């Protein structure tokens, strides 16, 4: 950072307008182990507790079957979109915020919104204060990601337009079945609603495509934590980047304060071979979460679905 912000450093200086830093969210900025991702726990809660009357029995079965280590694939994301069909964007945003106030059983004294890794939040602030523009590039749906970020320690450093995520289909209310949005116009007081349709899951190559489409410049810093982030990492450190660039990977190797499952030696060697700089949660994070938050005795807690 000192080198790229020094105008006297002709070889490495990066103008402010080009200081782009991109962060994955789940597992990079935030917890993904209570007992799974924020958006997935929200889906489970919506289907099985908060609004079971709004969803099909099929979606309830999908929600009830989710366990730690499940695959967060496009099929599941499509089910998320189906569950929230008919909600306005304001209603959906508000529900994502409301859900964050609930407590997880996978950690003690932790609401879902208390999910930010404090060292990563400090890093976001540090980069922002040194002229970097911060983007969150998440596999979580875009509006949900915005709700999380807006109620987090990084809310002052990441604006809603700097959040890129998975996209559900959204239509103007009353025109959900009209194939083309070119066939009608928005008027004062109209609502935008989730149709249940799905556009794109923001993982793997879609991350680099979305960055190109929505930012239009290569980042100079990228932070991730899994294979689904490697396209974003590689796009950042591509040899055609006109500026010096680095990519970092968070390794979930802390088994005391977190539900870590990764081996540091194995993952660090893998990442270094790919040109990424590994970050150890166990060794590099002096504190992970806020005061009083500790790992619970068990990660997964079965639900009583008798009702």
Question: How should each PLM-predicted stretch be described?
Answer:
Residues 6-9, 13-15, 73, 78, ...:
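Residue-level detector of functional hotspots within protein domains
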Residues 13, 18, 94-135, 139-307:
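C-terminal cap/substrate-recognition subdomain and adjoining C-terminal extension
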Residues 2-5, 9-11, 65, 195-196, ...:
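Mixed-charge, polar/low-complexity N-terminal
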Residues 34-35, 40-114, 118:
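A metal-dependent, Asp-based hydrolase signature
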Residues 1-25, 33-34, 47, 52:
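Non-catalytic pre-domain segments flanking phosphatase-related domains
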